[in-house]
A protein has these predicted regions:
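Aromatic/basic-lined ligand-recognition segments
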Residues: 153-249, 257-258, 262-277
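N-terminal low-complexity, intrinsically disordered segments
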Residues: 48-103
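N-terminal alpha-helical "arm" segments
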Residues: 27-48
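C-terminal segment of N-terminal export signals and the immediately downstream linker at the start
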Residues: 1, 19-33
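N-terminal export signals
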Residues: 7-24
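Structural alpha-beta junctions
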Residues: 62-71, 133-147, 236-246
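Internal, hydrophobic cores of structured domains that mediate oligomerization or house catalytic pockets
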Residues: 82-182
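N-terminal secretory signal peptides
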Residues: 1-7
Length: 277
């Protein structure tokens, strides 16, 4: 077993509380939700072999507690995929997908869905890193397109590979492998989408997959790029110093009010931070 795989398995099962979660997660009197997030990964392929991953990949899926959703996976094209990927492509990172990626979506012949186990907040980054590892192995095995359903985010194959590489390299420290800030950031970039334009805010969705609350930035503060920069700044601060400390230092508060119902995969049980004008 390679060191990265061993490290991820250990982190997912024997995770030691890190600085990002050293204090009260809410930083307010808000009662915690009992909802636990889950990854839903969507893979497209050229034929029905997609539904039967190679033994090595199947072992990785099982080792990390993921499972194939046999109800919605299918050995035929899904006519809605072009539109779905069209609204999910990451539009922040330059050239996050290519014409070849669009063609792969248009020409797919099979769809596979994977579900993660419910995520504990302290283990969210570890399981997201595992999800990224599974994405890499599925691409290696022939998957032609990948989308994170829990936040509605899609990247091209090269971008997925790059994010996986970032997570691997980011796990290396002078003391060995660790769930570092670099790993958390790679997972956030892989599985969260931003900015989504609401009526009043530019919003994130998917930060629950790395154990963080969503960040909503008032549109009156500036353009979308300014909102993305602030989202990154606050997310990095929460991962490094703790949610509570960041809320205190920035004089921000959490709220539970959100548009997603608790049974929606986009529901964030850790709340929302609204940054007003």
């Amino acid at each position: 077993m390679d060191p990265i795989r061993r490290h991820l398995l250990k982190a997912a099962g024997l995770f030691v509380t890190s600085r990002a979660f050293a204090n009260d997660q809410q930083g307010t009197s808000m009662q915690p939700s009992s909802v636990k997030p889950r990854h839903v990964l969507c893979f497209l392929g050229k034929d029905e072999s997609l539904l039967h991953p190679p033994e090595a990949v199947a072992r990785t899926i099982a080792d990390f507690g993921f499972e194939i959703d046999r109800t919605y996976s299918q050995a035929r094209p899904d006519p809605h995929m072009e539109r779905s990927f069209g609204v999910c492509w990451d539009r922040v990172f330059p050239k996050a997908w290519s014409a070849a990626d669009e063609a792969a979506v248009a020409n797919h012949k099979a769809v596979l869905y994977l579900l993660s186990p419910p995520l504990e907040q302290q283990k969210a980054v570890a399981f997201s890193a595992a999800a990224l590892r599974i994405v890499e192995e599925m691409i290696e095995a022939g998957a032609t397109a990948v989308k994170g359903e829990s936040a509605g985010i899609a990247h091209g194959l090269e971008r997925w590979r790059s994010l996986g590489d970032q997570a691997r390299k980011g796990a290396k420290t002078s003391q060995g492998l660790g769930m570092t800030l670099a790993v958390a950031k790679a997972c956030r970039l892989a599985f969260a989408k931003r900015p989504l334009g609401g009526d009043r805010y530019n919003e994130t969705v998917g930060y629950h997959l790395v154990g963080l609350p969503e960040i909503y930035v008032a549109k009156s503060r500036g353009n979308e790029w300014a909102a993305v920069m602030l989202m990154e700044e606050l997310a990095n601060a929460m991962a490094e110093r703790s949610i509570e400390a960041t809320l205190r230092d920035q004089k921000l508060t959490l709220t539970r009010e959100q548009d997603y119902a608790e049974d929606d995969f986009k529901f964030n049980p850790y709340g929302i931070i609204r940054v007003e004008a």
